[in-house]
């Protein structure tokens, strides 16, 4: 928890203080008073009755003593329960395939008033220009969009080709930006543990801010060393005892439930009254279809309450106050005097039914957000331009030669998890000894003209066809999986033609595709249109076999070398446990 930076974010002038205090004392008129409301007490449990009094961006007072206070406008909450605005502790907005402007339109009416975003997806493609665009979006947003400065671009040096670098000098230029809360996830945990100076330089430069971690499955002395370096949190835990040990060692735990990585069921039993200040909720990567149909952080709160019997005040605590404290955002996370008036009114607190949202003291209207979306997007000056520097491919580019009797490594997918297993399969004249083995390839898209890196994939469920995408963490090269080289080539050529995007091929034809014109990562369509297109893509993909719930998000992590156990980058097969490249053929 980093309270030393609170002054940076709590922008309030002396004149604003005087006006706020006058309303608190009852000597001046409030801007808004919310009547007929109960406030969920996140500290003690239970509820506080009485109005919420707002002046400007801030709460001037709470409680029955303000029942007769004057206001310019009164809001009748109709018996609703008021809770602080929800906070996502760690996400990559790009993974929603929405721009930050569209993301705000889709999630703010659901109560998501604050996000802590690491824009390392677009930074890996476009470098500092991508970070600058996210900062512009954050500056103009109604939603509190805070940024962690991307620390690992690329994710792991020398393991992949990406589109740009983001040097320490460039990082430092953004450190004091008003929307920056700290240093984003330090994914090269072996480098931190071994004391590599280049990585320690980054930690030292941001040590007065919040230092995000990334250490899936880490334990023992290595975990102790990683925490000793100053890392404060982790969102990659996927086992109960792993999460418990990190909490015991003083690390804050971000409980993640995204579209591919689903760790809430495994980790929710850890949450209790004692450790909840050290627990937070995050999505990491969540697609627009799930946001539209299930929700965002509101969906996670609902599951904590309904499926895991977490008390109301604890569930809402980990969705707001705990995260605000961790990042030094002490003006957020509570409905109390002097706090920013980010308020969610719930007609049903157990079902997280959002009735109305206020952010920075102003009611939010979903229709107004939608009507203003295109103008606000244009104002942010998105970095348009084709980022795909790759010539069309042919089936021969994916030709692999196998020798009967030999054993070959297979990337084994675990549905709804980002980790994979390293398996092997024996080849014979009739094919592999497992019928679920298909092909995977990664093609760099930044003009280096490398031959595709090819491998084998098991457990994905692809019985026919091919899927291709330019969303491929973290370097975002082209990843394609398929049953035939011809269909793989067709899918790849479609995303090249689109300037980036997603594609499904079956029966020798493109069944569905989605162009992503911003960095090959994001669409400029509305959230509703994007959700409909994702629905069509998923329907087409389901015709190819019993795939993961979110096949494109699951596929996007098959190239990320910092998550074990076996991955494929543009440079070849990578052993994520030994942190070294390995061969397709098993020779040991």
Swiss-Prot record:
Keyword Manganese: yes
Molecular function terms from GO: adenine deaminase activity
Catalyzed reaction equations: adenine + H2O + H(+) = hypoxanthine + NH4(+)
One matching Pfam family: Amidohydro_1
EC number of this enzyme: 3.5.4.2
Keywords per UniProt: Hydrolase, Manganese
Gene Ontology biological-process annotations: adenine catabolic process
Subunit structure: Homodimer.
UniProt xrefs under PANTHER family: ADENINE DEAMINASE (PTHR11113:SF2), N-ACETYLGLUCOSAMINE-6-PHOSPHATE DEACETYLASE (PTHR11113)
Name this polypeptide is given: Adenine deaminase
């Amino acid at each position: 928890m980093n309270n030393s930076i609170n002054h940076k974010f709590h922008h309030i002038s002396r004149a604003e203080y005087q006006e706020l205090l006058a309303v608190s004392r009852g000597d001046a008129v409030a801007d808004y008073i919310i009547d007929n409301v109960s406030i969920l007490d996140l500290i003690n449990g239970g509820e506080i009755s009485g109005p919420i009094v707002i002046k400007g961006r801030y709460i001037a007072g709470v409680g029955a003593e303000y029942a007769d206070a004057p206001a310019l406008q009164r809001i009748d909450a109709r018996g609703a329960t008021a809770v602080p605005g929800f906070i996502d502790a760690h996400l990559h907005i790009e993974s929603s395939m929405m721009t930050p402007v569209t993301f705000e339109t889709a999630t703010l009416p659901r109560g998501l008033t604050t996000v802590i975003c690491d824009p390392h997806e677009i930074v890996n493609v476009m470098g500092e220009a991508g970070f600058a665009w996210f900062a512009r979006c954050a500056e103009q947003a109604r939603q509190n969009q805070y940024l962690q400065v991307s620390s690992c671009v690329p994710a792991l040096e020398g393991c992949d080709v990406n589109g740009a670098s983001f040097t320490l000098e460039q990082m430092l230029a953004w450190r004091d930006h008003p929307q920056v809360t700290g240093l984003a996830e330090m994914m090269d945990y072996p480098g931190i543990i071994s004391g590599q100076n280049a990585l320690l330089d980054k930690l030292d430069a941001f040590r007065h801010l919040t230092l995000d971690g990334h250490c899936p499955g880490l334990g023992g002395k290595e975990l102790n060393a990683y925490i000793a370096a100053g890392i404060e949190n982790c969102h990659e835990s996927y086992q109960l005892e792993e999460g418990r040990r990190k909490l015991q060692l003083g690390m804050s735990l971000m409980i993640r439930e995204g579209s591919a990585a689903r760790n809430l069921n495994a980790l929710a039993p850890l949450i209790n009254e004692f450790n909840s200040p050290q627990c937070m909720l995050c999505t990491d990567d969540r697609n627009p279809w799930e946001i539209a149909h299930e929700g965002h952080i509101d969906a996670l709160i609902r599951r904590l309450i309904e499926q895991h019997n977490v008390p109301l005040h604890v569930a809402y605590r980990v969705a707001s106050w705990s995260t605000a404290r961790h990042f030094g955002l002490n003006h957020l996370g509570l409905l109390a005097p002097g706090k920013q008036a980010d308020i969610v009114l719930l007609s049903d607190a157990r079902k997280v039914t959002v009735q109305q949202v206020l952010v920075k003291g102003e009611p939010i209207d979903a229709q107004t957000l939608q009507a203003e979306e295109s103008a606000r997007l244009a104002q942010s000056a998105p970095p348009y331009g084709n980022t795909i520097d790759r010539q069309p491919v042919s089936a021969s580019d994916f030709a692999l030669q196998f020798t009967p009797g030999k054993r070959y490594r297979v990337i084994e997918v675990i549905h709804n998890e980002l980790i994979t297993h390293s398996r092997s399969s024996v080849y014979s004249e009739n094919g592999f000894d497992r019928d679920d083995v298909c092909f995977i390839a990664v093609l760099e898209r930044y003009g280096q003209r490398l031959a595709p890196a090819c491998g084998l994939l098991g457990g994905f469920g692809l019985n026919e066809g091919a899927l291709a995408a330019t969303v491929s963490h973290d370097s975002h090269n082209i990843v394609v999986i398929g049953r035939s080289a011809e269909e793989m080539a067709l899918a790849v050529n479609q995303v090249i033609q689109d300037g980036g995007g997603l594609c499904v091929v079956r029966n020798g034809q493109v069944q569905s595709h989605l162009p992503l014109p911003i960095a090959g990562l994001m669409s400029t369509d509305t959230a509703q249109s994007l959700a409909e297109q994702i629905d069509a893509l998923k329907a087409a993909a389901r015709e190819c076999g019993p795939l993961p719930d979110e096949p494109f998000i699951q596929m996007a992590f098959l190239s990320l070398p910092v998550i074990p156990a076996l991955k494929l980058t543009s440079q070849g097969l990578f052993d994520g446990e030994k942190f070294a490249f390995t061969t397709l053929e098993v020779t040991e």
